[in-house]
């Protein structure tokens, strides 16, 4: 074997690995974590912890396919602005490591696959909800709202709320009020979570021409909005306590108090003209949501008596 042949044979695995990692990056695995954090507790609450583990697994697979497909299509649509932002400049399409056509096909295959997987392993409603989520995220949020309004994440964030609806419908075949409350929790949680991160990268959004609220409003205006939505989030988690036991209710109160304290600290710091660390609220908002939904899962598995007596 010549030196050139040996070099090519050794380089092939490296190229394959690079390609696989590039396609994986298109799916935004960290974003998919929200699916795992919220969908499983929703399914457990739907049947008070007695859900078939295989149904949970199949729903998660279908949900991950849907999220991966939506995220990939989002990368295709946002390739031009990703190149202008430091935070996203290393994404595969921004670096041209994956052809746009291939990424589009990849995203469509994942999206179609999610529908048929959920339809075949759960029910038609969960499959249709997955398709609706993908369509909303790509067409309404990415193509319509993101570049046109500072309230983009408020309405566009509805797509991130759908895993609880998909999970609930996979178990029950219907949509009931606890699923709508969980939807509302994530809906209200999304703006403070996203805007806290956007405060850190507001110059990126300005450079890309994306009117994210921190890029077009004062810090005081942004933190006031963050505070309002944080209060709405916490109050909505308390409403869900009607369908749960004392464990979830206790954690919702304690975690909610902690989340509110952090939001007030950010707002008051900006109000006093002090240096603030919005990224801290962003990171802790992840922990808050994880703790609340983990408590919901444990409460459901233990089948603790609910405040409504059912």
From Swiss-Prot:
GO terms for cellular component: plasma membrane. The chain crosses the membrane at residues 31-51, 53-73, 102-122, 124-144, 149-169, 170-190, 242-262, 289-309. Keywords: Cell membrane, Heme biosynthesis, Membrane, Transferase, Transmembrane, Transmembrane helix. It is found in: Cell membrane. This is Protoheme IX farnesyltransferase. It is an enzyme of class 2 (transferase). Carbon 2 of the heme B porphyrin ring is defined according to the Fischer nomenclature. The keyword Transport does not apply. Converts heme B (protoheme IX) to heme O by substitution of the vinyl group on carbon 2 of heme B porphyrin ring with a hydroxyethyl farnesyl side group. Pathway: Porphyrin-containing compound metabolism; heme O biosynthesis; heme O from protoheme: step 1/1. The keyword Chloroplast does not apply. It catalyses: heme b + (2E,6E)-farnesyl diphosphate + H2O = Fe(II)-heme o + diphosphate. It is a multi-pass membrane protein. Belongs to the UbiA prenyltransferase family. Protoheme IX farnesyltransferase subfamily. Its main location: membrane. Its EC number is 2.5.1.141. It comes from Mycobacterium sp. (strain KMS). PANTHER family: 4-HYDROXYBENZOATE SOLANESYLTRANSFERASE, PROTOHEME IX FARNESYLTRANSFERASE, MITOCHONDRIAL. GO terms for molecular function: protoheme IX farnesyltransferase activity. One of its GO terms (biological process) is heme O biosynthetic process.
């Amino acid at each position: 074997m010549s030196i050139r042949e040996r070099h090519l044979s050794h380089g092939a695995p490296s190229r394959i690995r690079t390609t696989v990692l590039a396609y994986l990056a298109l799916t935004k695995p960290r974003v998919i974590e929200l699916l795992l954090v919220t969908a499983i507790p929703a399914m457990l609450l739907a049947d008070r912890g007695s859900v078939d583990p295989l149904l949970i697994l199949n729903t998660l697979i279908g949900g991950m396919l849907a999220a991966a497909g939506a995220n990939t299509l989002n990368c295709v649509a946002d390739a031009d602005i990703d190149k202008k932002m430091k935070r996203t400049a290393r994404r595969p399409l921004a670096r041209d490591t994956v052809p746009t056509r291939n990424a589009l096909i990849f995203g469509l295959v994942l999206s179609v696959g999610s529908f048929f997987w959920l339809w075949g392993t759960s029910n038609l409603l969960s499959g249709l909800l997955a398709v609706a989520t993908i369509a909303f995220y790509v067409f309404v949020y990415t193509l319509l709202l993101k570049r046109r309004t500072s309230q983009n994440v408020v309405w566009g964030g509805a797509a991130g709320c759908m895993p609880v609806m998909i999970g609930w419908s996979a178990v029950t075949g219907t949509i009931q009020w606890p699923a709508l409350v969980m939807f509302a929790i994530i809906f209200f949680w999304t703006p403070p979570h996203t805007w806290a991160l956007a405060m850190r990268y507001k110059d990126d959004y300005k450079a890309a021409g994306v009117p994210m609220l921190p890029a077009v409003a004062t810090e005081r205006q942004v933190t006031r909005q963050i505070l309002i939505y944080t209060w709405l989030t916490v109050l909505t988690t308390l409403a869900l306590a009607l369908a749960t036991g004392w464990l979830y209710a206790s954690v919702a109160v304690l975690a909610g108090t902690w989340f509110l304290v952090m939001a007030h600290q950010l707002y008051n710091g900006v109000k006093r003209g002090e240096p603030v660390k919005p990224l801290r609220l962003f990171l802790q908002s992840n922990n808050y949501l994880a703790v609340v939904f983990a408590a919901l899962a444990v409460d459901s598995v233990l089948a603790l008596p609910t405040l409504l007596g059912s």
